[in-house]
Amino acid sequence: MESENIISAADKARILAEALPYIRRFSGSVAVIKYGGNAMTEPALKEGFARDVVLLKLVGIHPVIVHGGGPQINAMLEKVGKKGEFVQGMRVTDKEAMDIVEMVLGGHVNKEIVSMINTYGGHAVGVSGRDDHFIKAKKLLIDTPEQNGVDIGQVGTVESIDTGLVKGLIERGCIPVVAPVGVGEKGEAFNINADLVAGKLAEELNAEKLLMMTNIAGVMDKTGNLLTKLTPKRIDELIADGTLYGGMLPKIASAVEAAVNGVKATHIIDGRVPNALLLEIFTDAGIGSMILGGGEDA
């Protein structure tokens, strides 16, 4: 038992020593985190995520969280007798569904995340893109193999982001938690894919990192091998051959766009892994897949 404790202590010391250069490097920088998947539904992972976010803030990194809420939305739609439908990974959202989406994201999910972070000593503040109209949206039309310009209801894409609200929260020492609901020119609400919001927000904030938490280890090839580094060219090939499809498409598109437009590192990581954020940011090996803005695959 004593030997095990010594080994454990040695491992902890090694981990701290490995983390120190990264703490120095990233202190003062912004990290936008797309929070979703199992990490949002399993109690132990939810608590671990909250602790990790608080730790990031304590060592000088400024986390900004953009959350999804697909399972929670589906559960509420089922309760009212509506079936969730998707086109190219995007949720079909009529007026009734939009009311439910906004209620679940802004009312339940956002407040739960804020409360969890604050329980562990953080100062999280929840906001929606409709607050101060800081996320302006326009209707998103989807091209499918059968038809171009498919209207899927009150689903939007980001037209512009005014980062003043989020930057103000960061300057006050707060952790912004953003619900991905935008506002149209007539004041109407738009459901925006959280990956799209996270990517665009990372660009506008000149973030050091964009980290997208998901339920898979990262981007895989057809044989199931993890691809640790990818370029836009390689990703185009994976989409063309059908390796990437469905819900991965908006995630990948956002990661690529952010990388191309100046976010220094974009990552797709496995949110099912305890301490996934810390493993990516503070260890030499990292986890998941890194999207590069250009150049050759490594």
Swiss-Prot record:
Site (Transition state stabilizer): K34, K251
CDD domains for the chain: AAK_NAGK-C
Catalytic reactions on record: N-acetyl-L-glutamate + ATP = N-acetyl-L-glutamyl 5-phosphate + ADP
Record family assignment: Belongs to the acetylglutamate kinase family. ArgB subfamily.
Gene Ontology cellular component list: cytoplasm
Subcellular location: Cytoplasm
GO molecular function annotations of the record: acetylglutamate kinase activity; ATP binding
Gene name of this polypeptide: argB
Keyword ATP-binding: yes
Disulphide-bridged cysteine pairs: none
GO biological process, one term: arginine biosynthetic process via ornithine
Binding-site list for substrate: G69, G70, R91, N191
The protein's name in its UniProt record: Acetylglutamate kinase
Function field: Catalyzes the ATP-dependent phosphorylation of N-acetyl-L-glutamate.
Main location: cytoplasm
Species of the source: Neisseria meningitidis serogroup A / serotype 4A (strain DSM 15465 / Z2491)
Keywords linked to the UniProt accession: Amino-acid biosynthesis, Arginine biosynthesis, ATP-binding, Cytoplasm, Kinase, Nucleotide-binding, Transferase
Pathway of action: Amino-acid biosynthesis; L-arginine biosynthesis; N(2)-acetyl-L-ornithine from L-glutamate: step 2/4
InterPro entries in the cross-refs: AceGlu_kinase-like_sf (IPR036393), AcgluKinase_fam (IPR004662), ArgB (IPR037528), Asp/Glu/Uridylate_kinase (IPR001048), Glu/AcGlu_kinase (IPR001057), NAGK-C (IPR041727)
The enzyme's E.C. designation: 2.7.2.8
